[in-house]
Design a protein with these regions (language model features):
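Interaction-mediating elements
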Residues: 1-289
Length: 289
């Protein structure tokens, strides 16, 4: 005969040693209920979830232990679990590495190709310019001793800021391939590594329009105020289309008009933009209360 021993039932979970993150927030990530069977992988899975939560708050040296104890000697099938946490200190950022930024230079001096300087110096200036786009993710140095510890949410916002910077510099196809955060060799700080794909730096080649009956192409192009040969900027393009051109229709009562741009690459560094306009019906005001 084969005897199968049932997994014990969970009676209670206790969190001990936590000062920076409240019990409620920790228990929310554990996804448990009192009375459930304690499966063999539940404890390890729970410890990993707690560890992930702490790392997102900047506590990369957190240590977690778990102890399972029966509620009493007679009832060994109802167990309490205690997670003991040694939070450690929040870790500062020792270095930020942006891989994949070698094709293009950024920063006023680095972009002046007529100024003779070593390639390494240009790359260093570019890295400095790119790091400056990360508003809240900063390397701690002796002159920036106030730099905050790593914060996952702020880092996510900073990645968006880096993407916006590239797209405003003409790199419409810019992509962040991956990002990672890990200890330095002696665990004295964190290394933030961002792998990127810059893509081509685009300029406008041609503009074309369809669906426009209220305005001729010359009027629309004048309102757009973008010229052939201009470097693409996502912020500038969005303003030109969805504010400047769109306002022509809004001012005449076409509140539901729609402008949709389509991009077609032309060669390595140029693109054509075709605008499809759906003017829809004019909106009239019936009553004003």
């Amino acid at each position: 005969t084969i005897e199968v021993e049932e997994s014990p039932v969970l009676a209670k979970i206790t969190i001990d040693g936590n000062k920076k993150i409240r019990d409620k927030k920790i228990k929310e990530v554990l996804s448990y209920r009192v009375g459930m069977r304690i499966k063999p992988n539940f404890i390890n899975s729970s410890m990993n979830k707690i560890r992930k939560l702490y790392k997102e708050e900047g506590f990369f040296l957190v240590e977690i232990n778990a102890i399972t104890t029966p509620i009493d000697r007679k009832n060994t099938q109802r167990n309490n679990i205690t997670f003991t946490i040694n939070e450690g200190k929040k870790m500062k950022i020792k270095d930020i590495i942006i891989d994949g930024s070698g094709k293009n230079n950024f920063g006023w001096l680095a972009t002046k190709k007529w100024i003779p300087m070593p390639r390494l110096l240009r790359e260093t200036m570019t890295q400095y310019k790119l790091r400056r786009q990360l508003k809240d993710t900063k390397i701690r140095t002796w002159w920036r001793f106030w730099a905050s510890p790593f914060d996952k949410k702020k880092f996510t916002d900073d990645l968006d800021a880096l993407s916006n910077f590239y797209k405003d510099e003409g790199h419409r196809d810019f992509t962040i391939l991956s990002d990672s955060v890990y200890y330095s060799k002696k665990k004295k700080g964190l290394i933030v590594r961002i792998n990127i794909l810059e893509g081509s730096k685009y300029k406008f080649r041609n503009f074309s329009w369809e669906g426009n009956s209220l305005y001729g192409e010359n009027v629309l192009q004048s309102a757009l105020n973008l010229n052939k040969g201009d470097i693409f900027s996502q912020t500038g393009f969005d303003k030109a289309v969805f504010q400047d051109v769109q306002s022509l229709y809004m001012d005449r009562g076409y509140l539901y008009s729609n402008i949709e741009p389509f991009f077609t690459p032309a060669g390595k560094d140029s693109m054509d933009v075709h605008f499809s306009i759906t003017e829809n019906n004019k909106v009239y005001v019936r009553n004003i209360n």
